[in-house]
Each structure stands twice: as structure tokens, then as C-alpha cells.
A protein has these predicted regions:
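Formylglycine-dependent sulfatase
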Residues: 2, 27-418, 427-448, 452-455, ...
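Extracellular, beta-strand-rich glycan-interacting domains
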Residues: 423-425
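Short, charged, surface-exposed hinge/linker loops at domain edges
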Residues: 462-476
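Bacterial N-terminal signal peptides
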Residues: 12-26
């Protein structure tokens, strides 16, 4: 009898244990598979590119701008404080950071050049989008967006060369979810002139750079720019929310940056920080934080990074050959080396205005060499005369002798052949230290670095465009006659 009871108890225990194991197995089977990340899966890459935008976000310390979405993105990712484009104008800059090559090396340095002469990229140089396509990435430059957003992407490319194949495979957001992994861009026009955005910033409270006169026109213009930045942020928020709603956020690296500096008189088209220094924020989902520099949310990175480094970095991270042949260098990933000691920039013809400027910047100093110093900073430029209210204000105040000492260089008849600035002591680059004997050696060091860069990268800037081509803004065929000042105002984009 006792043996029968013991056997019965053993059978019950075995049955209970079996049921418990089956129940546990059932619970495990019911766990969402989304919580397990396949680290061999290639991440999606989404670039959010703002036109003509400096580091004027709340997370960079700018006042009177409302940027909660980009500030949150910075809190969840890495914010770079010393990220520089290699050109202060869109077409040359984009030609560089989409190839990972200096625009001066590949013949793409003059603004909007080679549009009608069939010019192609040098052998071995490719767009990042084409490299990623070969690695199985679907590529898109988004124009068509969800109707609920209420806006479209600009689809801007603006390259100074001709392609045999389209730069991207699609322009539709709706294609992304069904074509992974993807590399996509959304280009935002909000911070490109003319500024059109709801009013938020108080002109009386905006922080205007000290080289501009403290004038109502200046304050209004700067406030409108910051309002455009706030509107840009609102639209970025819609993109990030859509990414999450579609379940794409956990496998998408999001990159936000500016294509060149802000469209102000001493910004865009010039080789100061105001023309070359732009924001860079990268958000890496926790599921794919495998490489160094990707591990800490809310990190602030103060290394020097060039925009051409983006192509090299994402080519490397996608495990695509060719990154080691670029001028850019990876700044994230297993093969990223020490950070840069110097970044370089160049400005050549923009519109009808011919300048040749070269610059090298270290962490603390900037050296600028002007090969065309006979011209004024306010050299004739139809685009700026029509769209920059401060441009014309400066001329008016100069005629009335109402400009302060920091603004006078803006209206001088010529520009210095050389400029040298201490960015730590003088972040707005207002005090030219080129003749300071105490800095003789450090200036010489920067001169040598620029000479070395010009030589080693085979800078093509010394080969000037034919005069007629320059006059026609890069066209080899005559341009159609321009409209009169009133009708054309605000029409021309650059």
C-alpha cells in the first residue's frame, strides 16, 4: 500500500514538474522576438541635413531658439562640438561629404560648376550612396513624405559633377520599411533664405555676433533665422516620431548635421567658423551599440571632425571597401584612429564672385590665406544683395560713418592676405593676430600645415575657370537674361 502511495506521489510530482516546464517554455516562446537584436544585421542609416545651418540649437547653448526634438536626440546620442564642412557653400560642400573627398581634389570646388560640360568624378571616386548600394543598401533622398507631416523633403543633391547613374534609387518615405537596410537622406530648406517660419524669437533678446551692428534690421534678421531653426526642429520631430511608429527606430542610426554654415554676411561663403562650423548629432540605438564611441547616451565629443569623414565612417561601418582611399577618415568604428589635429576648408567662385580662400583650423586656432585679397568682403554678389538685408544695411551705415570698429572690416575695400585667430579667446574671430610676435611659431606651424595640405591633396584651385564661365556662374553656355530687381527678389536660391 505504501509503495503504491509513493509511486502515486512520484507520478504526481513528475506530472507537475512537466507542466511547469511546459508552461515556462510557453512563456519563453511568447516573448516578443523584437527584444533580441541580431548583431549581424546591417543597420539602417538616416541623414537629416539642414541647409545653411550653424550650431544654433538649444543643446549648443543658443538662446531664443526652440529645439526640443534635436536637443532630445543629442541627449540620446552624441553631440559633436567641432564638426566642420570643407566648403562654406552647398554644392562644393555636398560634393565633398558625399564622396569623402576634398572638393578641391576632385575638381568640384567652384560653386555650381560642371553642370553643362559633362564633367565626371575622377576614377575611383564614388558617391557614398553608390558604395552602399553595392553592399545591399537601398538608397533614397526623400521628397515624398507621409501626408500627415505637411511638408516634403527638398531632395537636394547639388553636386558639381555629372553621374552615369541616379544618385539614389527612390524619393519616397513609404519605400523604406520594405527595403531594409536603407541609407536615406531628408534635406530641410527651412534655414535657407528666405526664412519663412512662425515667429518665436524675440529680436530684442537674440544674441547677435559682435561684428554686426546692434541694429533693428540685424536683430530681426537673426530672429527670423532662429525661428527657421525652430521650425526645422518641429519637422525633425515628425520624422523621428514616424520612425518610431513604424518600428524602424531600433535599427536606424540617425545623423543630423548642416550642409555648410549659416546664411549671414560673414557666414556662408567665407572660411570663418561661421561659414564652416555646423552641428553634428548622431543617435545610435542601444541595440546596435557595438563600437567604441557609441556606448554613452548624452555624450559631448570635442574632437575635430571633418564632414568628409562621414562618408569614410559609414562606408567602414557598412563593411564596404574603399573608405581607406578617401580623404575623409573614420571617426567611429574598429579602424578609427586618433582624432584629427587639423581640419581644412576652401572657398572658390560662388555665383559670379571669384574668391580663392584656404584655411586650416586646429582645436584652438584658425589660419586663413586669401589668394584674392584685392577684393572686399562685400564684393558684388547678386544673390546676397537681394536676399541679405544686413548686406545692404552695412553699406548704408558705412556711408553714414555709423559702424563700430568690429564691423569696419566687413566694409573695407580689401581683405587681409592672411588672418589668424585664437578661437578660445576670440570665438567670433574679430581680432586678427597674424602680426603677433608671441604667436610667430604657432602661425608658422599652421602655414606649413596648409602648404602641406594644398600639395598633398593636389588642390586644383590655382587653375581658374575661364572668365566667361565665371561670369556665367559656372555655365559654359550663356545664361538667360536675369529679371529686374523687383521681380527677381527672393527667387534665386543658392
Amino acid at each position: 500500500m505504501l509503495d503504491q502511495q509513493a509511486a502515486s506521489l512520484r507520478a504526481c510530482a513528475i506530472l507537475s514538474l512537466t507542466l511547469m516546464l511546459l508552461s515556462a517554455a510557453s512563456l519563453v516562446a511568447q516573448e516578443p522576438t523584437a527584444t533580441k537584436y541580431d548583431h549581424n544585421k546591417k543597420p539602417n542609416i538616416l541623414w537629416l541635413v539642414a541647409e545653411d545651418f550653424g550650431p544654433h540649437l538649444g543643446c549648443y547653448g543658443t538662446q531664443e531658439v526652440f529645439t526640443p526634438n534635436l536637443d532630445q536626440m543629442a541627449a540620446e546620442g552624441v553631440r559633436y562640438t567641432k564638426f566642420f564642412t570643407t566648403a562654406p557653400v552647398c554644392s562644393a560642400s555636398r560634393s565633398a561629404w558625399m564622396t569623402g573627398m576634398y572638393q578641391t581634389t576632385i575638381g568640384a570646388h567652384n560653386h555650381r560648376s560642371h553642370r553643362d560640360d559633362g564633367y565626371k568624378l575622377p576614377e575611383g571616386v564614388q558617391l557614398l550612396s553608390h558604395r552602399l548600394q553595392k553592399a545591399g543598401y537601398f538608397t533614397a533622398n526623400i521628397r515624398e513624405t507621409p501626408a500627415a507631416w505637411g511638408f516634403r523633403g527638398s531632395g537636394k543633391t547639388d553636386f558639381n559633377f555629372n553621374l552615369d547613374e541616379p544618385a539614389f534609387e527612390s524619393d519616397k518615405w513609404s519605400d523604406l520599411a520594405t527595403h531594409q537596410p536603407f541609407y536615406a537622406q531628408i534635406n530641410f530648406q527651412e534655414t535657407h533664405r528666405n526664412f519663412k517660419a512662425p515667429k518665436r524669437a524675440d529680436p530684442a533678446k537674440v544674441e547677435v555676433p559682435p561684428y554686426y551692428p546692434d541694429h533693428e534690421v540685424v536683430r530681426q534678421d537673426w530672429a527670423q533665422y532662429l525661428d527657421a531653426a525652430s521650425e526645422l526642429d518641429r519637422k525633425v520631430g515628425l520624422v523621428l516620431a514616424q520612425l518610431k511608429a513604424e518600428g524602424l527606430d531600433k535599427n536606424t542610426v540617425v545623423v543630423f548635421f548642416g550642409d555648410n554654415g549659416s546664411a549671414h554676411v560673414r557666414g556662408k561663403q567665407f572660411c570663418y567658423d561661421s561659414g564652416l562650423h555646423v552641428p553634428l548629432i548622431i543617435r545610435w540605438p542601444a541595440e546596435i551599440n557595438r563600437h567604441k564611441h557609441m556606448k554613452t547616451q548624452g555624450t559631448v565629443n570635442r574632437d575635430l571632425v571633418a564632414a568628409i569623414d562621414l562618408a569614410a565612417t559609414f562606408t567602414l561601418l557598412a563593411n564596404v571597401p574603399g573608405w581607406d582611399k578617401m580623404d575623409g577618415k573614420p571617426f567611429i568604428g574598429d579602424f578609427s584612429g586618433p582624432s584629427r589635429e587639423y581640419v581644412f576648408g576652401a572657398r572658390d567662385r560662388c555665383d559670379e564672385t571669384v574668391f580663392r580662400l584656404r584655411t586650416v583650423r586646429s582645436s584652438q586656432y584658425r589660419y586663413i590665406r586669401n589668394f584674392t585679397p584685392h577684393q572686399p568682403l562685400l564684393a558684388a554678389n547678386d544673390y546676397k544683395e537681394r536676399q541679405y538685408p544686413v548686406w545692404n544695411l552695412l553699406k548704408e551705415l558705412a556711408a553714414e560713418n555709423k559702424l563700430g570698429p568690429l564691423a569696419l572690416p566687413l566694409v573695407a575695400p580689401t581683405m587681409p592676405e592672411e588672418e589668424f585667430y585664437d578661437l578660445e579667446a576670440d570665438p567670433h574671430e574679430t581680432k586678427n593676430l597674424i602680426a603677433d610676435p608671441a604667436l610667430k611659431e604657432v602661425i608658422a606651424q599652421h602655414r606649413r600645415q596648409l602648404d602641406k595640405w594644398i600639395d598633398e591633396t593636389k588642390d586644383q584651385g590655382a587653375i581658374m575657370e575661364p572668365a566667361e564661365v565665371a561670369k556665367n556662374e559656372g555655365r559654359t553656355k550663356p545664361a538667360s537674361p536675369k529679371s529686374g530687381p523687383t521681380k527677381a527678389k527672393g527667387k534665386k536660391k543658392q
